[in-house]
């Protein structure tokens, strides 16, 4: 088995963990390859470009936050991703730094399980050709630098859902419901729910609300504006700039993201801790 290691080298703790992990793997004579930028900053090898890791490795290890895991999952395709959280509590990264070695040992002896997560697939036409992009968390169309409030036209399975004057539209998976969508007022959805949520960003009308739909729906979004370019983001990566009236088609991808599961992880506890639910009540309890 060969591991691909992707680390957020902007975080000192991730750097220390990467050195600890590679030292441990060396001591066990386990093969690994670091993503080239991580390897350069760490001064550790062997390394390869991130888009080559899927071809030469069996499983990815992400050292960082949810953003680092999203990056790793984008290149892992269907290969498992083991997420080690550094810093703030993550919704996607399943293990903390103290659990890292134990988690890797479980992978090596085959005693691990997988959480399958649904992805979005966004399709546009570019120079007469289809361009397809995938996202684990969300697909976002934003107003960008357009000086006015554009109108976003949304259709479900070809039927008009509505026209929203807003700063943007977020289409999120249940996994991504705790990311940008939540910040924009969208609901929190349990990770394995077979739904998507469409969340407007700063809508101009108070009656406009997020809507939860079945994940078998095909969503079409276009921007009704006279001019301008509108960023299309997949998991925070700007994939291209959309022209007025251009349509983006979003649906469930056929490919799943496979995350190495932490069976001791309590999702409800994560919500309470991350979102400070019940903190006032907890702090009032006698010691």
From Swiss-Prot:
What Pfam families would the database entry show?
Answer: NAD_kinase, NAD_kinase_C
List of residues binding NAD(+): 66-67, 137-138, 148, 165, 167, 178-183
One Gene Ontology cellular component: cytoplasm
Localization per Swiss-Prot or TrEMBL: Cytoplasm
Residue ranges of the TM segments: none
Instruction: Show the coiled coil region(s).
Output: none
Q: What is its EC number?
A: 2.7.1.23
Please give the catalytic activity noted in the UniProt record: NAD(+) + ATP = ADP + NADP(+) + H(+)
Record HAMAP family: NAD_kinase
What name goes with this protein?
Answer: NAD kinase
Give the organism, scientific name. Answer: Chlorobium limicola (strain DSM 245 / NBRC 103803 / 6330)
């Amino acid at each position: 088995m060969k591991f691909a290691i992707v680390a957020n080298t902007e975080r000192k703790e991730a750097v220390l963990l990467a050195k600890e992990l590679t030292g441990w793997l060396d001591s066990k004579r386990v093969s690994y390859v670091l993503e080239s930028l991580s390897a350069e900053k760490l001064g550790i090898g062997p390394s390869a470009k991130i888009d080559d890791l899927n071809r030469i490795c069996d499983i990815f290890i992400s050292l960082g936050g949810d953003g680092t895991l999203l990056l790793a999952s984008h290149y892992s395709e269907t290969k498992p991703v083991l997420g080690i959280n550094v810093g703030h509590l993550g919704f996607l990264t399943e293990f903390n730094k103290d659990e890292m070695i134990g988690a890797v040992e479980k992978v090596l002896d085959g005693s691990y399980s997988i959480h399958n997560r649904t992805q979005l697939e966004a399709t546009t036409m570019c120079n007469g050709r289809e361009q397809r992009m995938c996202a684990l968390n969300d697909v976002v169309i934003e107003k960008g630098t357009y000086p006015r409030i554009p109108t976003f036209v949304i259709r479900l399975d070809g039927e008009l859902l509505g026209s929203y004057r807003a700063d943007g539209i977020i289409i999120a998976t249940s996994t991504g419901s705790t990311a940008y969508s939540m910040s924009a007022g969208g609901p929190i959805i349990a990770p394995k729910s077979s739904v998507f949520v469409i969340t407007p960003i700063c809508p101009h009308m108070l009656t406009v609300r997020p809507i939860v739909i079945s994940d078998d729906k095909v969503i079409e979004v276009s921007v009704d504006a006279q001019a301008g370019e509108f960023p299309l983001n997949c998991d925070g990566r700007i994939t291209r700039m959309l022209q007025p009236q251009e349509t983006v088609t979003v649906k469930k991808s056929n490919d799943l993201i496979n995350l190495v599961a932490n069976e001791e992880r309590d999702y409800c506890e994560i919500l309470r801790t991350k979102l400070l639910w019940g903190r006032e009540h907890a702090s009032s309890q006698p010691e």
